A protein has these predicted regions:
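C-terminal extracytoplasmic interaction modules
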Residues: 1-179
Length: 179
């Protein structure tokens, strides 16, 4: 449960996927669209189709990798500031308007100060609540902002990880901080 966005102490489910598929489409694309409805990710691995969801991780139980676990050197990267957003317009299906698309917006003043006003637009597939659409827009903006990426290769201990696995990485080049 998450706050319902109306103030007070009301809560609602984090995601409700409320969709009616009305046309034929490529199965892989339909599954990817469904996974997008809960911030999921699809991938093909080990000769099976896999879906993982974006869920909060218990940071006290994360596996910590160190440079000793890495073959070669880790490579850090992130996107350009030119591609940073400070707000989002989100289309969602409004049940009060016969499920016609309606647009809602989110904006983050701290990011506007840092990157100026840059807007992205997205469609929240299967979303029928404005509060959920705003959360999805906020997730899109902040995940775009917090995009430090590390690329690394491991030995056999790397078999424990699949795409979407959350882990910590301790690198002495960052003064012993864990990222």
């Amino acid at each position: 449960k998450v706050p319902d966005g109306k103030g007070g102490s009301g809560t609602e489910p984090r995601f409700i996927f409320d969709v009616y598929i009305q046309s034929q489409a490529d199965a892989w694309q339909v599954i990817k669209d469904i996974a997008a409805g809960f911030n999921g990710m699809t991938f093909w691995g080990n000769n099976t189709f896999n879906v993982v969801s974006d869920m909060p991780a218990d940071t006290t139980k994360l596996q910590i990798l160190t440079r000793a676990s890495v073959v070669g050197k880790p490579n850090y990267s992130s996107g350009s500031e030119k591609n940073r957003y400070s707000s989002a317009l989100i289309n969602f299906s409004d049940p009060d308007n016969h499920y016609q698309d309606r647009t809602t917006a989110v904006m983050f003043p701290d990011l506007v100060k840092q990157f100026k006003f840059k807007q992205t637009q997205l469609t929240a597939i299967g979303c029928t609540r404005e509060s959920e659409a705003q959360r999805r827009g906020g997730w899109a903006v902040y995940s775009n902002y917090l995009d430090r990426l590390i690329t690394l290769q491991t030995g056999l201990d790397g078999f424990a990880y699949v795409p979407g696995t959350v882990f910590a990485f301790a690198d002495e080049r960052f003064s012993g901080r864990v990222y």
